[in-house]
Curated annotation (Swiss-Prot):
Subcellular location: Cytoplasm, Cytosol; Cytoplasm; Rough endoplasmic reticulum
Protein name: Small ribosomal subunit protein uS14
GO cellular component: cytosolic small ribosomal subunit; ribosome; rough endoplasmic reticulum
Organism annotation: Plutella xylostella
Subunit organization: Component of the 40S small ribosomal subunit.
Cofactor mode of binding and number, as noted: Binds 1 zinc ion per subunit.
Main location: cytoplasm
GO BP terms in the entry: cytoplasmic translation
UniProt binding sites for Zn(2+): 21, 24, 39, 42
One Pfam family recorded for the sequence: Ribosomal_S14
Amino acid sequence: MGHANIWYSHPRKYGQGSRSCRACSNRHGLIRKYGLNICRQCFREYANDIGFKKLD
């Protein structure tokens, strides 16, 4: 049983390890509200494309 078989063999059905950004696959700073599932860095990049408007 080599390293490749053991690495990431634990089931990830819930928790922080089960979710990732849909744009960059990052697991930190996820925005899950409204089903976005996008990290905060990508949200800043794609906010206008998604339809979020910045109010002054």
